[in-house]
Amino acid sequence: TEGISVAICEQTGDPATSKGPVTREVVRIITPGTLTEEALLDAQKESLICAVFERGGDYGLAVMEVSSGRFEVLQTSHLDVLKSELARLGPAELLLPQDAQIALQLEEFKGIKHRPVWEFDESESNQKLKDQFGVQDLSAFDCSDQPVAICAAGCVLAYVGETHRRQLPHLQRLRRIRNEDTIIIDPTSRRNLELVHNLLGGREHTLLSVLDQTKTPMGGRRLARWLTQPLRDSIEIESRLAAVATLQQHSTFEPLRAMLAQAGDIERIVARIALQTARPRDLARLRDTLALLPELSEVMTTVIIPEAPSLLNTLADRTRAQPVLADELQRAIETTPPVVIREGGVIKAGYDETLDELKSISEDAAAFLVKLETEEKTRTGLSSLKVGYNRVHGYFIELSKVQAQEAPITYIRRQTLKNA
């Protein structure tokens, strides 16, 4: 159901030391705009959370895609520009200050949530952003003249931090949306043009459905974003078209597409790893995608020629192999790991000696206990020594009354029986 939030609680106390009920805490709040789980996300669609703040006739907008680490801001003095941006973005959640008058003007948008006014405080927001990015000021992000947008960004950052209950290391930069570089399409025109959604809200018979020949989820989402935000600059448009034409005419075009079809959704996998919510198969997909990079890089180098478009040369330069990480994952992760880590069988044998020993104990506990009993008998010289188990004490070592006095000082007496 849209708009529902779910709190996840986990046991954080130790039952062995807790007096009374074991301590439990909320470790995550899942909301529509802060999803990162693969099963809850549409691979072809962005999942966005936005915040809007109004002050002195200026409107500040902040946009975050938690599942990829994208973080953007916009400031405008025109309400229609703000509405056009929100219509383009289609956020799953829209954060507004409590009792804000602007709520009446934005009631057409879904997912509105009211947040405390202090979360939009400019000074607090500035500090939160500087702490997040590890900088002394925000001038490097070209946002110094966007104070109202910074207020909105501070609210989004606080909200996402509150719901995820952890640091957000994959948020590494703040980007300024420059709508003067793109064509602004009003909500009505956008709906009637059926760029990415048809009039019924589906994707069939849209411009995107006709043009989308992408091979990766990341490419599909990027294409949709480009279609909803058309460029104004003819030079940049020609640069994109020239890059596409060069690739299409190159002999490596089809092999390149075949390789990309094998790639995982790296953008979202990396975000889940940063948020410590990745599952074993995320690591397997990352491993398999990294394994493609050497060949992918080799193919791209054949495209780098003096007359190639600069955009293509930049892309080729960024397609680099990561041998250290690829080798680490290849040695560590099983070929086909389970869906969830609690099922075991994630780490390959031979990767970690201590883990191998623990797995051996887990898989053959009876043999381990016999071995332990034999070793302890030999070490202590106590022939009556036995290893046993009960529900009260768990595993224990039992000695006869005669030999109990000879027990090593490292043994701790738990109970005295009739003859032991």
Features from the language model and the residues they span:
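Active-site proximal loops enriched in glycine and acidic residues that flank catalytic Cys/His/Asp
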Residues: 98, 389, 401
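Divalent-cation-assisted or electrostatically stabilized phosphate/pyrophosphate-binding catalytic cores
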Residues: 410-420
